[in-house]
Amino acid sequence: MSFAPDALGFAPEWDAPVRYIDRTHAWYDALGTDNHYRYAQYADVPFTPLVQPLSACRVALLTTAAPYQPDKGPQGAGAPYNAAAKFYKVYSGDTAHDHDLRVSHVGIDRDHITDDADTWFPLPALRRAAAAGRIGALAPRFHGVPTNRSQRHTLENDCPEVLARCREDGVDAAILVANCPVCHQTSSLTARYLEAHGIATVVMGCAKDIVETCGVPRFVFSDFPLGNAAARPHDPASRDTTLELALALLEHAFAPRTTVQNPLRWAGPPEWKQGVLNPARLSPEELARRRAENARIKAVAQAVRDATLADSARA
């Protein structure tokens, strides 16, 4: 480790799960956002236990990652935040085929994301689980859930659509993999909705405070940078072990708000926690540049959203 341990073996005070609610508020305040965002918070949490063994269940994969769009600019590892690549409608894909999904459209930790899609889209691991008989079957489709700051839109539009598609596929349980801070809220709201309608769920994520503040039935927390909820990058063993935590939680959780923490540590230095979404680390010049960039990104995202909603209204 790159820090001196306490005499009693304590970790540094900052080596704890990042408080993303506080960080995002401070970050966007520094960027000039004038409205204080309220994250979803519930007192009660729905809970649907499995009614049959997991080895007999059909399991769906839900993601906030976006299909790669070659005409929308850089979207791979190292790409800047790309609002043009956002999506605002639920989409589905055939789980029998491979898919090129990216996460440049969301506010992940760009310094610690790689080209290893297994960290945010564990479709290969779920295929292996199905082949091994760990789950009864992988649902024929995975579903992409839009990341939307409007909780009302998520609850009134996207969640019912996801539920309808899961029911069409005969789904018994769903695994939801979150990426950015708002993705964690979206995944949590979707999990709650599915659970209230009889589908067992587990969220895999890295923003512990956002998920637990919203309140979900089951949560696998990996203390990794955002965008790595399903595995450590380029660590094949971590893909199946992290998924197994989610599968075991589906089987054995007996009450809502059950969180299991991934015992794996991030492979790199833990100091990433001090820098992520921390405006104090930016020079005045860099902060000014980020403010201008944020204004441009918001305009692009709004244009994409407006166009999507207009298309939906005409359909």
Please tell me what each predicted stretch does.
Residues 2-234, 238-245, 249-250, 257-315:
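Metallocofactor- and cofactor-centric catalytic cores in central/energy metabolism, strongly enriched
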